[in-house]
């Protein structure tokens, strides 16, 4: 048996007070992991989360359960993760709409979008597009902005301060089209309903949920915000080639966790997730929604650096056009 003097010596050395990571946590993971989707079922975050979860579960040997925590434009679920224990059992599919665009446009946030998280890697990204109905008189972006110089042309977005809102404001200024009018909605779905009902002339939105209607011809894209034309839609020009390079952008999804995630867990996830993203069955699903991994995909410090740069750039845009979410 250990005598009192020996115990005191061990305590002074920190052996008793500070057990190692493996002793404190056991082999991670040893129970189910929750993967938080901060938007409702059916959207981009939910779709990607449910594609990733079973593959991640197989790689880690524990179940990975997608938990939808929507509300306040993604802030509720994201804030829940920020305040969760950093034990590897709560992960987040982070979204640029929260960590970049909300950070750029909101007067206050319940968390620091960088400091309160362990940001591991970008997963996929989706460009934005300008959509019109198939029977729209606007066949080109030039026709669209020319009309908006002399009469009201309405574009819908998923809400005030969203990436589509900011892109529309930039296009209006760059094209000198002052009557390009923003109509905000509580999400993309009601905006699409009004576009199809002819209540608005156009919509700016991530390509993800619009791929099928573009393919079947019910919607026409006038421009895409990707750096190059999309192989799946080679006839859709980029904003850059049409003279609007400042509109080149994308909405990314990433893998994040609460701040202070132990390094061995970070290393394990950094090892298993990138190969998962490259599996043929996932690449096909990502291609189906035109939401693909960047090449190369930034991770760790590079991912955080990308995030900081985007927050700074979009904060400047928001201030230029006085776009503030209270």
Where are these predicted regions, by residue range?
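N-terminal export signals
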Residues: 6-24
